[in-house]
Regions:
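A conserved regulatory-domain signal marking ACT and ACT-like small-molecule sensing domains
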Residues: 1-168
Length: 168
């Protein structure tokens, strides 16, 4: 088993941040495994999974020295995958934007014990009306016995105009 350090990063965006993170991790013999980063409202934010030697304090302390970033870490032991008890499904949503839409979607998914593994949302101007349209792409982990048709019906009840599509 490998020790892994899960690091969250947030701070003002600037050129070269990923290079600084990668160089710091490599200098401390960490191995960059997985990551996801975004720029939102001028802020750089994301998460990276790093294989580390020992407890990983050296890697975390070195990362925390990068100016202008709030960096936090959690050490975990990477476990081998257990028997498949869930299915991975992709979901796409489009509808008129309104307050509480993400809460409503998350509530329905939680009701069916469906875990959100990845969530990307954005707004766009409607082609015909110019009204703001809400878009979401989700990767979900659902119990094998969950009725995805029932989940679909419940999601469609959130709003008359919400388009719900399971992706392949």
């Amino acid at each position: 088993m490998n020790n892994v350090l899960i690091v969250s990063v947030i701070g003002p965006d600037r050129s070269g941040l990923v290079e600084q993170l990668a160089a710091t991790i490599a200098a401390k013999n960490g191995n960059w495994l997985e990551s996801s980063f975004s720029r939102l409202a001028g802020q750089f934010s994301g998460i990276v999974k790093v294989a580390v030697i020992g407890a990983g304090e050296e890697v975390l302390l070195a990362l925390q020295q990068i100016a202008g970033l709030d960096i936090r870490g959690v050490l975990d032991v990477e476990r081998e995958e257990t028997a498949l008890v869930s299915q991975s499904v992709a979901l796409s949503l489009i509808g008129h934007d309104r307050v509480g839409i993400v809460k409503d979607v998350a509530t329905i998914l939680a009701r069916f014990a469906v875990n959100i593994e990845k969530l990307e949302t954005w707004l766009s101007s409607g082609a015909m009306s110019g009204e703001m349209m809400f878009h979401a792409q989700l990767i979900l982990s659902a119990p094998l016995d969950v009725d995805l048709d029932q989940v679909h019906r419940q999601l469609e009840c959130i709003a008359d105009d919400l388009m719900v599509e399971w992706a392949d």
